[in-house]
Amino acid sequence: MTTTGYIGTYTKKEGKGVYRFQLDEETGKITEVKTGYELEASTYVNQHNHFLYAVTKEGDDCGIASLKIESDGTLSLINKCLASTAGNGCYVSASPDGKYIFEAIYGAGLARIYEANPETGEIVRLIQELAHDYPTGPSERQEQPHVHYLNTTPDEKYVVAMDLGTDKVITYEYGDDGLKVYDTIEFEPGDGPRHITFHENGKHAYVVHELSNIVSTLKYENGHFTEIERHLTIPENFDGDTKLAAVRISHDQNFLYISNRGHDSLAIFKVGDEGATISLVDIVKSGGEFPRDFNITESDDYLVCAHQEGDYALTVFKRDKVTGNIEIVDNQETAPEGVCVQFLR
């Protein structure tokens, strides 16, 4: 079986935009990596139905590109909505019904919501650009709000934002009029919450904190979060420069994976108590430099990790579904400045 994947990249050095790759799940080898669509600053991509949405910019104009996924996995442009000059995005997602697109803007501390046509994939308009205005954290990286993630909750009723600059998670109501704050939760000063992933039961979530290298387990209910426990994602005796990046849960919901940039590793946690608790299994080297993102195949057999720096390795790990452990089976292909990994669903 061959699985198609997409890599979002920076385009500051050698990156060309969105890359498309093929993974042979019989051998665990990546058989090809090609430029899927040349797009400036396409650092995050996300799929909804037959459409792939990507953050992008042209000069000072910033926003979202909509790409059609053809039957063979190739990409063609539907349209772009470059409606702001306030900063380019770092995360993009779509509402489950495809009517809204959400974009997180790290540098300017903004949350954007767009109207989209769920039938054609066209981005119709920018509805709102909302600036976060909360007290910031104590770290020098927290000089202002920094929105790093914006996506819907499992109940589809809210949008949740991670703000690295203010140590807060904010939930919003959303609709044709834009975003309206519903609730906030504040973490420890200097945590720097970056990304979140949910257990499929919709009752628990896992937030990774970029600055403290901590993962928090949370209880979720109707737009409200409560922190349950905290775990370090790097060895306690490591004193080098490192910052946490991505978090993914295996499709069987049994294991949580987290990437550490600097330590250049993947932390593996066993999920217990129906998602309420996690326990460290191992911390494994990622196979390259600066592993900003990775993803797990639908089969749960493989994990593919992109590396932003060094030789830009695209590393394939074979997963043990029982223990959660991973082992490198392919480290030959590259994706320049790769920072986002998504598999075609």
From Swiss-Prot:
GO terms for cellular component: cytosol. SUPFAM superfamilies: C-terminal (heme d1) domain of cytochrome cd1-nitrite reductase (SSF51004). InterPro entries: Cycloisomerase_2 (IPR050282), Haem_d1_sf (IPR011048), Lactonase_7-beta_prop (IPR019405), WD40/YVTN_repeat-like_dom_sf (IPR015943). Gene3D superfamilies: YVTN repeat-like/Quinoprotein amine dehydrogenase. GO terms for molecular function: 6-phosphogluconolactonase activity. Belongs to the cycloisomerase 2 family. This is Uncharacterized protein SSP0869. It comes from Staphylococcus saprophyticus subsp. saprophyticus (strain ATCC 15305 / DSM 20229 / NCIMB 8711 / NCTC 7292 / S-41). The lineage of its organism: Bacteria, Bacillati, Bacillota, Bacilli, Bacillales.
